[in-house]
Amino acid sequence: MGAVTTDVEVASSVPAQTIYKGFLLDMDNIIPKVLPQAIKSIEIISGDGGAGTIKKVTLGEVSQFTVVKQRIDEIDAEALKYSYSIIEGDLLLGIIESITSKFTVVPTDGGCIVKNTTIYTPIGDAVIPEENVKEATEQSGMVFKAIEAYLLANPGAY
């Protein structure tokens, strides 16, 4: 079947630099703080925090999954781009080789637009269930909205 790709764009009234720093660069700290039931912790297991860094993400009690390994693929602070791939873990269902999320934050008058492309790469000819992709897209949207609400309530945080 091949890879499955989703594209999502979300407008926000939070400034682009704030979204980039809070939502993407500091996700290790902000997500467990804002959504501890979804993600308990994120820790670096190798690397310096830049491209190539591997992180262990321990998921919270609302997730049916437990732990994933995530690799940072790109950090471009000037272009406000960030990408990472999930490369190990039960979330891959034994049929997905990797899930790559690519973010670009685009400044607008009074805020920004966050563009996210997610690529689900199957193992061999495996078919990735459409409902899993839809659920993951919805959950990502909920995480973004929760972090956006935190950033709006704490304008000096980033």
UniProtKB/Swiss-Prot annotation:
Any one Pfam family here would be Bet_v_1
Kindly give the PROSITE patterns that the UniProt entry links to this protein: PATHOGENESIS_BETVI
GO process annotations (BP): abscisic acid-activated signaling pathway; defense response
What is any one of the record's Gene Ontology cellular component terms? cytoplasm
- Cross-referenced InterPro entries, in alphabetical order? Bet_v_I/MLP, Bet_v_I_allergen, Plant_def-hormone_signal, START-like_dom_sf
Superkingdom of origin organism: Eukaryota
Q: Protein name, please?
A: Pathogenesis-related protein 2
